[in-house]
């Protein structure tokens, strides 16, 4: 009897407006990461969802990988001891292949600040690294410092980030995404 749930797997710049419309219709949502390309939009969606009884699920595909589930289990069962240092590296190369002049690329939207937000590297790749760090360790980030920049003169979005974190158990961590 009608639509019960929808999946949002569009460019991240579209997530907010699509999700907002379906929240208003009380339809359950499965949304690909990142939730939105702007913090303000994410907070607005959270506020809207809290006024409903819908399920709003955000997907992080790598947490389903058996290797990561096993790593999480090792940490959870204290098989490797207390986590003191965390290092996550997630280098990518697709922005090298996608140039502004390449109008045919299906990834071109990732080079548009209006679609992916001010920092493509954090919203599109950093979100994977951040989620994996939290998923495997079970720890929460309490402090963060980052240097974010673009390594390419051909694109206008950030495509490189060095991130330093302090976790809730005082462990230190680093994330490099590029």
Positions of PLM-derived features:
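Short strand-turn motif at the edge of the Rossmann-like AdoMet-binding core
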Residues: 33-34, 59-62, 90
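Structural detector of well-ordered beta-strand residues that form the stable sheet scaffold
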Residues: 30, 55-57, 87, 110, ...
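NAD(P)-dinucleotide binding in Rossmann-like oxidoreductases
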Residues: 151-158, 168-178
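Rossmann-fold dehydrogenase core element
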Residues: 44-62, 82-86
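Predominantly a Rossmann-like dinucleotide-binding segment in NAD(P)-dependent oxidoreductases
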Residues: 63-147, 151-154
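Short, Asp-centered acidic motifs that coordinate Mg2+ and/or phosphate
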Residues: 4-5, 85, 172
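Beta-loop-alpha module in the N-terminal Rossmann-like domain of NAD(P)-dependent dehydrogenases
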Residues: 1-48
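A short helix->loop->beta-strand "cap" motif at the edges of active sites that frequently abuts
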Residues: 25-27, 52-54, 171
């Amino acid at each position: 009897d009608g639509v019960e749930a929808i999946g949002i797997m569009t460019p991240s710049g579209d997530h907010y407006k699509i999700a907002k419309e379906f929240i208003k219709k009380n339809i359950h949502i499965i949304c690909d990461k990142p939730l939105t390309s702007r913090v303000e939009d994410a907070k607005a969606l959270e506020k809207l969802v809290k006024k409903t009884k819908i399920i709003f699920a955000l997907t992080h595909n790598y947490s389903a990988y058996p290797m990561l589930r096993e790593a999480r289990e090792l940490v959870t069962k204290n098989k490797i001891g207390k986590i003191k240092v965390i290092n996550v590296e997630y280098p990518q190369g697709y922005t090298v292949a996608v140039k502004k002049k390449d109008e045919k690329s299906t990834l071109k939207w990732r080079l548009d600040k209006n679609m992916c937000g001010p920092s493509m590297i954090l919203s599109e790749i950093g979100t994977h690294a951040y989620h994996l760090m939290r998923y495997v360790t079970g720890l929460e980030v309490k402090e963060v410092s980052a240097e974010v920049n673009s390594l390419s003169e051909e694109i206008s979005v950030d495509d490189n980030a060095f991130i330093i974190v302090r976790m809730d158990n005082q462990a230190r961590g680093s994330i490099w995404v590029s």
